[in-house]
């Protein structure tokens, strides 16, 4: 009996240990499962287009914040693969020719149109992006709907193309027209974007200047509605007829002799260093340059949108065919939170589609913004952007007053006025004229100076190759002669 009791005890103890071990193993497996990534979100975005920390004291990156937020809401760990590109065309090639299957990309307006036309992207389930519906500016949502982009895309960033200038060495009044780029008063002090579309645009603005000025007068005289005015400007600034392309080529050839050069990404740094005094710039790059120059003690850079008309652009998130829609839409919803949007805008310089209290509070803290207007302050009415998105703040808070010296600074660069938007055009896809514009731009880029550099470089390479071959042959002949001499001695 005693033995039986002992055996029973041993059995129960063993069973207890087995159960304990089983429970422990199950717990470990569950923990491992929870910590291991169950899915991977693959994002392809523009370079320098999302917040990342610069020190250990900074907030975590938006990518890391999203991963943590997703885990808190679902209990699932995810991975994020984040790749970048520098042009829409590079992105398009990656999507169509590459082997990577991305879930989310952020093309510009004209490229969104192309991807829709070619049936390369998925539709968006708007019920999955409540933050976007609640906080994306209704003005921008309406614009997406007008173009038919809203079915496929959710806006991410938007901005303009204008003139970044040094107010200490240029006249601000000159910056109100694109014609200043051709003014020999600023010869060799100007850099322009090494970009086919932006290059063609400034050429168009120069060629169409008289027609654009005439439209402006008609609008100001009440002969055109805002909608009709914007449509007329858009048609002029999207003209790709053979006659217009030829005129733009002549204009750009003339511009060639007046500029310091073209640049891809160096323009903002050249402005900060004072290498040039004027640069055709995207608004986000202008914000970066303005801020960095001021931070270095030289608050001399400002940004202008020419009065005859400018370019306005919109980048949006789309999901390529076969994307993980649930994960992609979860990310869109996360970055559409106003707090995340404010963090993003402060870091990259570009303007988020997202409005809301956090964003409005953020820009009210910008330099040059004052609470009480005076005779000299500039009124910037942003109710068009924030209306319908504020939870606690009053819409009257979206009317900001700026000290005169800060007009053209960070705030007015990031947030153009309603009047500036009316006279700005979205650039469309060039369509069948694309190759003609490409050829025209290539001819513009092939300046005499560049051709001479290519000739010199080619001749130098040819000489080096010839010398290397000569040295190789001479060395081998000498070696052979030595071997023959040794053999002759042995004989």
Provide a role label for each language-model segment.
Residues 32-118, 451-453:
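Early extracytoplasmic/lumenal segment of secretory-pathway proteins
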Residues 388-490:
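Conserved C-terminal helix/tail region of periplasmic/extracytoplasmic solute-binding proteins
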Residues 315, 320-413, 417, 464-467, ...:
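Mature extracytoplasmic/periplasmic domains
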Residues 67, 257-322:
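Extracytoplasmic/periplasmic substrate-binding proteins
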Residues 20-37, 472-476:
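Sec-dependent signal peptide cleavage junction
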Residues 46-60, 108-275, 289:
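Extracytoplasmic ligand-binding site segments that recognize negatively charged/polar headgroups
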Residues 2-26, 461-471:
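Sec-dependent N-terminal signal peptides of Gram-positive bacterial secreted proteins and lipoproteins
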Residues 81, 134, 138-145, 217-237, ...:
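Surface-exposed intrinsically disordered loops and tails
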């Amino acid at each position: 009996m005693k033995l039986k009791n002992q055996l029973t005890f041993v059995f129960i103890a063993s069973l207890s240990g087995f159960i304990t071990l089983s429970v422990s193993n199950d717990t470990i497996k569950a923990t491992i499962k929870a910590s291991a990534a169950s899915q991977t979100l693959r994002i392809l975005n523009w370079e320098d287009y999302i917040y990342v920390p610069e020190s250990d004291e900074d907030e975590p990156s938006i990518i890391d914040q999203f991963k943590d937020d997703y885990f808190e809401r679902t209990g699932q760990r995810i991975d994020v693969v984040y790749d970048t590109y520098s042009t829409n065309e590079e992105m398009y090639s990656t999507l169509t020719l590459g082997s990577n299957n991305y879930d989310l990309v952020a093309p510009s307006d004209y490229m969104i149109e192309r991807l829709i036309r070619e049936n390369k992207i998925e539709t968006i389930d708007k019920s999955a992006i409540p933050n976007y519906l609640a906080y994306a500016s209704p003005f921008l949502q309406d614009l997406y709907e007008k173009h038919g982009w809203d079915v496929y895309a959710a806006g991410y960033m938007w901005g303009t193309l204008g003139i970044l200038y040094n107010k200490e060495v240029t006249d601000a009044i000159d910056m109100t027209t694109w014609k200043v780029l051709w003014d020999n008063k600023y010869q060799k002090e100007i850099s322009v974007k090494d970009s086919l579309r932006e290059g063609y645009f400034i050429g168009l603005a120069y060629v169409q200047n008289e027609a654009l000025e005439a439209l402006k007068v008609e609008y100001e005289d009440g002969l055109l509605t805002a909608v009709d005015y914007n449509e007329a400007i858009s048609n002029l600034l999207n003209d790709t007829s053979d006659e217009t392309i030829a005129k733009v080529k002549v204009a750009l050839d003339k511009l060639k002799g007046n500029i310091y050069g073209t640049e891809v990404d160096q323009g903002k740094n050249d402005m900060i260093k004072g290498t040039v005094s004027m640069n055709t710039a995207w608004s986000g790059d202008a914000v970066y340059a303005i801020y960095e120059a001021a931070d270095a003690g030289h608050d001399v850079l400002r940004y202008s949108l020419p009065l005859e008309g400018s370019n306005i652009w919109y980048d949006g998130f789309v999901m390529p065919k076969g994307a993980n829609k649930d994960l992609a839409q979860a990310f869109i919803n996360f970055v559409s939170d106003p707090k995340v949007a404010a963090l993003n805008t402060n870091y990259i310089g570009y303007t988020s589609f997202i409005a809301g209290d956090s964003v409005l509070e953020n820009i009210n803290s910008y330099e040059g913004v004052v609470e009480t207007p005076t005779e000299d302050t500039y009124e910037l009415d942003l109710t068009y952007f924030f209306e319908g998105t504020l939870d606690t703040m009053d819409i009257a808070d979206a009317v900001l007053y700026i000290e005169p010296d800060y007009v053209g600074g960070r705030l007015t660069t990031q947030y153009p006025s309603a009047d500036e938007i009316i006279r700005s055009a979205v650039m469309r896809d060039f369509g069948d004229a694309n190759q003609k514009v490409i050829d025209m731009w290539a001819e513009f880029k092939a300046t005499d100076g560049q051709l001479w550099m290519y000739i010199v470089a080619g001749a130098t390479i040819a000489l080096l190759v010839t010398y290397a071959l000569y040295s190789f042959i001479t060395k081998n002949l000498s070696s052979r002669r030595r071997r023959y001499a040794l053999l002759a001695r042995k004989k």
